[in-house]
Amino acid sequence: MASYSTNEFKGGLKVLIDGNPMVIVENEFVKPGKGQAFNRVKLKNLLNDRVVEKTFKSGESVEAADVEELTTVYSYFDGDSYVFMHPETFEQYMVSEEALGETKKWLKDQDEYQVILFNGQPISIIAANFVNLEIIETDPGLKGDTAGTGGKPATLSTGAVVRVPLFVQTGEIIKVDTRTSTYVSRVKD
């Protein structure tokens, strides 16, 4: 299997540490006045999203992780797993609720998602940065009710709850940032 030397480290590189697939979040090369140079690296575990910091001596090598990212389309829920299909090969990937994580609240039929595979098995799903969803329930905004600028909670068609401005009504379609779970704008038809 391929390996990377410390001088090849950069953000986004996927490596295998203690049998766990990790992605390099941050890499800092340190050359102390005395002693050997080293790399201080922040790594994010792809299985559980934990971030750890490790140091590697200059010239040390790390095994490359067998991690693959595929663009897929969400098809349906199968009772105990979520089914995603590759749009060209029609290959289906069964994803557990555990691997789905926070992305579950943004799932919409026929939308595209990134499936992360480790050794051929799906380990996580990444939603698009922005999704358009319909508001199925929110309190009506009262005219002149502008004392609080925090907005009001709105339940979306996927079951997610986000805070929206007072002028947004039930039945409207809004754009939501999936990374922060925040309202971005109304979507014009």
UniProtKB/Swiss-Prot annotation:
InterPro entries named among the record's database cross-references: Elong-fact-P_C, NA-bd_OB-fold, Rib_uL2_dom2, Transl_elong_fac_P/YeiP, Transl_elong_KOW-like, Transl_elong_P/YeiP_cen, Transl_elong_P/YeiP_CS, Transl_elongation_fac_P
Record PTM text: May be beta-lysylated on the epsilon-amino group of Lys-34 by the combined action of EpmA and EpmB, and then hydroxylated on the C5 position of the same residue by EpmC (if this protein is present). Lysylation is critical for the stimulatory effect of EF-P on peptide-bond formation. The lysylation moiety may extend toward the peptidyltransferase center and stabilize the terminal 3-CCA end of the tRNA. Hydroxylation of the C5 position on Lys-34 may allow additional potential stabilizing hydrogen-bond interactions with the P-tRNA.
Pfam families reported in the protein's UniProt record: EFP, EFP_N, Elong-fact-P_C
Pathway the protein takes part in: Protein biosynthesis; polypeptide chain elongation
MF GO annotations: translation elongation factor activity
Keyword line: Cytoplasm, Elongation factor, Hydroxylation, Protein biosynthesis
Main location: cytoplasm
N6-(3,6-diaminohexanoyl)-5-hydroxylysine: residues carrying this PTM: 34
Record-linked CDD domains: S1_EF-P_repeat_1, S1_EF-P_repeat_2
GO biological process, one term: peptide biosynthetic process
Domain of life (superkingdom): Bacteria
GO CC term, one of those recorded: cytoplasm
Record's subcellular location: Cytoplasm
SUPFAM superfamilies per record: Nucleic acid-binding proteins, Translation proteins SH3-like domain
Disulphide bond pairs: none
Family affiliation: Belongs to the elongation factor P family.
Protein role: Involved in peptide bond synthesis. Alleviates ribosome stalling that occurs when 3 or more consecutive Pro residues or the sequence PPG is present in a protein, possibly by augmenting the peptidyl transferase activity of the ribosome. Modification of Lys-34 is required for alleviation.
Listed name of the protein: Elongation factor P
Native species: Francisella tularensis subsp. holarctica (strain LVS)
